[in-house]
Regions:
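Extracellular/periplasmic carbohydrate-active domains that bind, remodel
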Residues: 1-223
Length: 223
């Protein structure tokens, strides 16, 4: 079991973009329409998450590159309250999810980068946090390549969670379609639309309602 004091350092998960062949050449990840692998037997989104920490696992994960399009996500953390830390992970080129936290407490994520490609990542969610608490996400860089033509409603989805802290979030794409918003709180149907911000705390409580103001046009005595 990977406990709080364990370490994974400098790991590149095989598969997907950037994979070299045995003879040294580049492995082409696309068919001629960018809709699948050239070998149809190598199905996108058909494997378990590349890195799965579960059932009380934890520890430090440093300098990880997980770009395998064949996996359901780059990293899944589930069912653990053991302390965990992620430093400088790049999770890229997945079909559905880049990083997922399910029923997790006491984890900190620093300098995470996610990236979606046009062919496989049009509907990919960079970060999902579900039924979790006491989570810190800091210096998070969320990116989509310029050729993406499929918009997506949000970059981070938080549901049934509390004490979630975001620090220094950068959500960027130089394509015409990107994310409509950055963070979506599903429990309260609240969307954070700002792409660059220094901090945001989600306590789990409903957001404060804005004060009601009389309309300038309909106020008594208006001309």
């Amino acid at each position: 079991m990977a406990g709080a004091g364990s370490l994974m350092n400098d790991v590149r998960f095989l598969g997907g973009h950037g994979t070299s062949r045995i003879e040294g050449g580049r492995d082409n990840p696309y068919n001629n329409t960018h809709t699948a692998d050239p070998d149809l037997a190598r199905r996108w989104d058909g494997q378990y998450p590349s890195l799965w920490v579960t059932d009380g696992g934890g520890g430090t994960f440093f300098d990880i590159w997980t770009p395998g399009t064949f996996a359901q996500s780059g990293m899944l953390v589930s069912n653990t309250a053991t302390e965990g830390r992620i430093y400088q992970m790049s999770s890229e080129h997945h079909v559905r999810y880049e990083v997922q936290l399910h029923n997790v407490s006491n984890w900190r994520i620093y300098a995470l980068q996610t990236e979606e490609e046009r062919g496989e990542g049009g509907f990919a969610l960079p970060l999902e946090i579900d039924s979790s608490s006491n989570i810190t996400v800091a210096n998070f860089h969320i990116y989509r390549v310029i050729s993406v033509f499929q918009p997506f409603p949000y970059a981070v989805k938080v549901s049934n969670s509390k004490d979630i802290r975001f620090r220094n979030i950068h959500c960027y794409s130089n394509s015409k379609v990107s994310f409509d918003g950055t963070i979506y709180d599903q429990a309260h149907d609240a969307l954070m639309r700002q792409r660059e911000f220094a901090w945001l705390d989600l306590s789990g409580a409903a957001p404060a309602a804005p004060p009601k103001r009389d309309s300038v046009v309909l106020a008594d005595g208006a001309n």
